[in-house]
Amino acid sequence: MRIVVPMKAVPDLVEEIELTADETDIDREYLKFVLNEWDAQALEEALLVKDASGAEVVAVGLADDPDIDQALYTAIAKGADAAVKISATAASSSTRTSDRAALLAGYLAAEPADLVITGVQAADDLDGQLPPMLAAHLGLPHVSVVVAVAAEGDGVTVRQEFAGGRSHELHVRTPAVVGVQAARQAPRYAPITRIRQAMQAGGLQTAEATPAGAAPGLTVRRMYRPEAAGQAEMLTGDVDEVAARIVDLLRDRGLVKG
């Protein structure tokens, strides 16, 4: 079984985020990028399938993604058999989900996989559209919000999670696309020495792909910081003064009596 795991680099949320002048995107020039946390879960689940069945795991990323090399080398250090950096043969955007799905579909049309395991969503979109869009391009069955995958017979058995702690199991014939919410265990740690070994070995492959027919997708009209709906009053003084002021405020609002 050949498993392909698409990976995406997203802005590190510990960084200060600034907007572009036209307020349609974040300013990416000086940001640090890290692997999307849901893709890290997807990679771990793929590696668990490999551990159990001997499957081949190939991590792929788009060449336009900042810092994607680090994520791909880390995937090799964790146990992926190969890592591929994909470039588009035509103009394509790596920030729009529809364009990412089209380019990944173009690669997979040339390099088919028995199973595509990707994160259910990304930290910079939270729309969950990549797995179903990719499956639609490829004409494959798709299951998302998955928390376990196991190779079985002519396909895979997956556990899909619902609200309220409910879940159910499905058997899906391969080839198929699976969107992982969480792996069965926390993503494994890759020692720095192993990542450096992967870098020194020059293990990244490159590939060109022609995007499949992309849907128009979404257009961001405006990004802006949350608008303040009220104000906070800072209380100063010693403990007794602050306590008395709090009681007065609660009385003024009718929340306490006396």
Summary of predicted features, one role per range:
Residues 1-258:
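N-terminal glycine-rich FAD/FM-binding segment characteristic of electron-transfer flavoproteins
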